[in-house]
Curated annotation (Swiss-Prot):
This is D-aminoacyl-tRNA deacylase. An aminoacyl-tRNA editing enzyme that deacylates mischarged D-aminoacyl-tRNAs. Also deacylates mischarged glycyl-tRNA(Ala), protecting cells against glycine mischarging by AlaRS. Acts via tRNA-based rather than protein-based catalysis; rejects L-amino acids rather than detecting D-amino acids in the active site. By recycling D-aminoacyl-tRNA to D-amino acids and free tRNA molecules, this enzyme counteracts the toxicity associated with the formation of D-aminoacyl-tRNA entities in vivo and helps enforce protein L-homochirality. The keyword Cytoplasm applies. Homodimer. PANTHER family: D-AMINOACYL-TRNA DEACYLASE 1, D-TYROSYL-TRNA TYR DEACYLASE. The lineage of its organism: Bacteria, Pseudomonadati, Pseudomonadota, Gammaproteobacteria, Alteromonadales.
Amino acid sequence: MIGLIQRVSEANVTVAGEVIGEIGKGMLVLLGVEKEDGDAEIEKLANKLCRYRMFSDEDGKMNLNIEQVGGEILVVSQFTLVADTQKGNRPGFSRGATPEHGEAIYKKFVHALRAKGMAVSTGEFGADMQVGLVNDGPVTFHFNV
């Protein structure tokens, strides 16, 4: 499971011209699901994101987590994160989960974050989406669990 995490002052996701998810201060999570991902990866990444200190304290140090700043999370599925880009000029997706498995893991991941008390908005799995964001910093982290 791959998560590309961006600290944002705001973010939204649009499908067919309609905003279906939006947040204020918080994190945008672009989530790529691999074939072998399961409950262990879901819990590991969900726990990591809830505890990860990527928000600034009063001294400007990255010392606060999402809960401590009252932030929100926007989760958007992005299968291109699992692409193999090592050979050739076209990405390969052999590591990626099937659409059925990917959607199930995506939904379980969102549920895991909500079960930890996080305010979570989402995109629409498998849809053609437009994602808007204001990256605060910029601050971006790549997690591979």
